[in-house]
Structure formats: C-alpha cells, structure tokens
Amino acid sequence: MSQQEAVDAAFLPTLDLSRLVSSDAEERQKLVRACEVYGFFYLDLRSDAELIALWTGVLDLMGQYFNLSLDEKMRDSRNSDTHGYEPVATSTGAQDDLPDYYESLKASRDEVLTQSSKLAPAVKANHALLNRFIERAHAVTMMILRQLSIALELDDSHKFEAFHRHSEESLSTLSMFRYPKQEVLDVGVGHNKHTDIGTLTFLLCQQQGLQVLSKDPVGWRFVQPLPGCAVINVGDTLRFLSGSRFRSAVHRVIPVDQLQRQDRFSIAYFLRAENNATLNAVGGRTVSAKDWHDEKFDVFRKSREAQASDDVLTGGMERDM
C-alpha cells in the first residue's frame, strides 16, 4: 500500500470467524463495538477452508460467465432485483449525470433452495456450487446475529434471528458483480452511494474500489481488501431492529484511478429479514422488510435529484455525518 493509499484507507476492526463461532465473549464485545461505531468490519475466514474454496469456485464461475456475449447473458435476464442477470447502466452511478457501471448475476436464496423454475439458466447450471456458497454465507451471517442477540441480552421475541426464520419467505440474495474495464468514463461509473437494504452483507472482494463514508475524519475512505477476509456491513434492517444502536454506513464503489483499469469482481450475500417483518424505518415510518426492499430499489433507479429529495437511498445516515 502506498503512503497516499494508507492515508485514504478506512480503519476497520478485524474479527475472527473461529472465535465468534465458539462464542468467545471478548470477540463478541468487539463485534458489538464494530457494529455500533463503524457499521463495517473485516471477518477473517482463514479458519474455514471450505468457505475459502467456495470463494475461489464462485470467482472462477464469474470469470467465465461475465466474459460471455451480452446476448448470451441477457437470456438470464429476469427484470428482477433478486434473481437473474442485470446489465450495466440500469441505475444512477457514483458521479453526476452518469449511470452505474457494473453488471450482475443474482440468485435468490429461497429460489435456489427450492430450485425454482424462475432461476436463470446460469444459476441452474451451477446450482450445487451456488447453493453451497449461499448455505455457508447464510450460516455465517445468522451466527453473527445470534452473537449480537446474546451480547444485548435480548428476549426471544426481540432476538435478531427471530426476524429471519427459515420457514418464512425472504429476499436474501447472492449477487455476483463485475465492474468492467473501461476505456472512457462517459459510459458510466461505479455504484452510487447508499446504505444496504437488508440486515447484514457478507462481501468478498480482492480488489479496491469500495469506499465507506467516514465520520472521523469526515470523507470517503477506501476499504482495503485483506487476504482471506470478508467485509461485513450492517444494513438498514439491523439498524432499525437495534433501535439505531447499530450503524448502517453509507458506502459506494468507485474506480481507484478515475477509470476502471481492469475488471473488478465482488461477491455479496445479502441477508434480509423475512418479508413480513415489521421495521421502524426512517422518519418514524412503519414498513415491512419487503416494502423497504422494493422502495429502496425503486429509488436506486431514480434521478440524482429525486434521490436527494428523501432519505431512502442512504437510510437517513448521511444526515448524521
């Protein structure tokens, strides 16, 4: 890391997966503080050989898939926010007057579990790999929720995991992103600033580009990839369920060197609450988890001026800076 990169890097704490799995009390308190102060943290996965191998397997799949022609990938399009292919430039980008510049392949957890007919052909063809990855990412994020519930001594009805029952439908989704190499900037840029919709995001990426809006010092800071580590962040739902104790940090994706000089790949598992879970959202509104999801995706596609007119895009967090 260069001296300038070090200056521009966000400080995030690093937690150990194996210590959280074993319900280590000290690690649990570090987890609570990370969620309260930063809303982001690194999770060291190197104790879990299977998860590291699955990461490599999904990256290999992405390298093959995203190199297909656009016509071939569009066969997987489902015009959905939770499954299928989505081409570049469908939402507002990270800079004024430009759209986003990423493409994605998504797989809904519920539909993968049931092998739904809605699954994109590319997901069906790689069902075993993607199903296992989703199982493991889901297990890790649910374990984190349980540790937070223990730390806060929540009663059964208020435990965070109680809003994520296996028997209930949810919009939890695996999303595989490619930010294509760019020759010119005017085609689009990055991924616009936002807070995540759901409860927790489990992110795997080996390349720079993710930025978090820091409170001290105020400004955008790059999240440096660490070998063998996931980046975990708090989403709006966990912020709402915690009574705003936990922080859903504003973040974006933007090229480090103005243009995206090489393809950038990232894998995100978005843990989301069951669809009918009731949330006390921004402005004192009461909404279901599904309605918050749908409303926020609608805002992603609006103009920058329309996005600035309410607090949905950044979950009200930008006002707290």
Curated annotation (Swiss-Prot):
GO terms assigned for molecular function: dioxygenase activity; metal ion binding
Recorded metabolic or biological pathway in which this protein acts: Antifungal biosynthesis
Region (Disordered), start-end ranges: 77-97
Induction (free text): Expression is positively regulated by the cluster-specific transcription factor frbF.
Domain of life: Eukaryota
Binding site for 2-oxoglutarate: 264
Assigned keywords, A-Z: Dioxygenase, Iron, Metal-binding, Oxidoreductase
Practical applications according to UniProt: FR901469 inhibits the activity of 1,3-beta-glucan synthase from Candida albicans and Aspergillus fumigatus. With minimal inhibitory concentrations (MICs) against Candida albicans and Aspergillus fumigatus of 0.63 ug/ml and 0.16 ug/ml, repectively, FR901469 displays greater inhibitory activity than other 1,3-beta-glucan synthase inhibitors such as, WF11899A, echinocandin B, aculeacin A, and papulacandin B.
Residues covered by the Fe2OG dioxygenase domain: 169-273
GO term, biological process aspect, one: small molecule biosynthetic process
SUPFAM superfamilies, per database record: Clavaminate synthase-like
Ligand binding (Fe cation): 194, 196, 251
EC number: 1.14.-.-
InterPro entries the record matches: DIOX_N, IPNS-like_FE2OG_OXY, IPNS-like_sf, Iron_ascorbate_oxido_reductase, Oxoglu/Fe-dep_dioxygenase_dom
Family classification: Belongs to the iron/ascorbate-dependent oxidoreductase family.
Function: 2-oxoglutarate-dependent dioxygenase; part of the gene cluster that mediates the biosynthesis of the antifungal antibiotic FR901469, an inhibitor of beta-1,3-glucansynthase, exerting antifungal activity against the pathogenes Candida albicans and Aspergillus fumigatus. FR901469 is a cyclic depsipeptide containing 12 amino acid residues and a fatty acid chain. The NRPS frbI contains 12 modules responsible for the formation of the depsipeptide backbone which is denoted as Acyl-Thr-Ala-Tyr-Val-4OHPro-Thr-Thr-3OHPro-threo3OHGln-Gly-Thr-Orn-OH (C71H116N14O23).
Protein name in UniProt: 2-oxoglutarate-dependent dioxygenase frbH
Taxonomic source organism: Dothideomycetidae sp. (strain 11243)
